[in-house]
Structure formats: structure tokens, C-alpha cells
Design a protein with these regions (language model features):
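An alpha-helical repeat/solenoid feature that recognizes helix-turn-helix modules
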Residues: 1-142
Length: 144
């Protein structure tokens, strides 16, 4: 998930240059994200995925990985997609009273199977980016 969801989260630039979001590779990416989304709307994947590929898309939920999945789905399906709405709600529900998110798991790859990185701002940057994109897409839709 780390690599796949991160790359799908980067798809809004594809939209900006006119990429057809109904192309088969985009639809496959969105279908994969939906297949690994947890019933509560979150996403998570363990770093052990690099050693055991059967664990792809499985692991404890994290705010950064939920944001990555949500941004990929937003780009592919828009803000009204039920999977996007569930992910946004999970991010909102898991904010601390201070307005941030806790994240104890490593979500940075580093060198797979050698070492992993903990980017301390991922837990803030990516959820805020996802929520702001969601809000912007809703505002654009309302303006017509």
C-alpha cells in the first residue's frame, strides 16, 4: 500500500494535464484501493509487505495511509464516492483535540527489508492535504 497508495495519491497532477480518469489503469488503481479499504473507511499497510507480498494493503490504520488512499480515490472517482466519504470521516473522527493525528507506525520505506523511516510530519501533512482537496472539490461542485 505504501508505494501503491502513495502513487495513486499523486494522481491529481494527472487530472490537471487532462489525463482521462476513466483509463483502465486508473480504474484498476481505484478498484485496488477500494479492495483494501477497511470497513471503517481507513487504510493501513505494514512494512512487512516488502517481505510478504500477501500482506499488501493490510495492517493497522494510519492517518497518512488513509489520506493517500483517499486522495487516489478522489482523483479517480470524485468527492461523492462512498469510499472517499468514509475515508474523510475516518480522518475527522481520528483527529486529536489539538487537531492533529497520532501515528505510531513507520510508513516510510527507506530501503525495504533493511530500514524504514518515520517521517514525523506525514501524520499531519497528508491528512490535511486530503481534507483540503476534499473541501476544494466539494466547493467546485457546488459552484457548478
Amino acid at each position: 500500500m505504501a508505494a501503491k497508495a502513495f502513487s495513486t495519491a499523486a494522481s491529481p497532477p494527472s487530472m490537471a494535464v487532462g489525463e482521462d480518469m476513466n483509463r483502465p489503469y486508473i480504474l484498476r488503481a481505484a478498484a485496488w484501493l477500494r479492495s483494501v479499504q477497511k470497513t471503517d473507511g481507513s487504510f493501513g499497510e505494514t512494512c512487512q509487505t516488502y517481505e510478504d507480498h500477501s500482506l499488501k494493503g493490510q495492517g493497522d490504520s494510519t492517518a497518512s495511509q488513509t489520506a493517500w488512499g483517499a486522495m487516489g480515490l478522489m482523483a479517480a472517482a470524485g468527492p461523492d464516492d462512498p469510499a472517499v466519504i468514509k475515508a474523510m470521516q475516518w480522518l475527522i473522527d481520528h483527529q486529536t483535540p489539538a487537531g492533529d493525528w497520532t501515528e505510531e507506525y513507520f510508513t516510510g520505506t527507506g530501503f525495504p527489508k533493511v530500514f524504514y523511516l518515520k517521517y514525523h510530519l506525514y501524520r499531519l501533512y497528508f491528512p490535511l492535504t486530503a481534507l483540503s482537496r476534499y473541501r476544494r472539490l466539494l466547493a467546485i461542485r457546488q459552484r457548478g
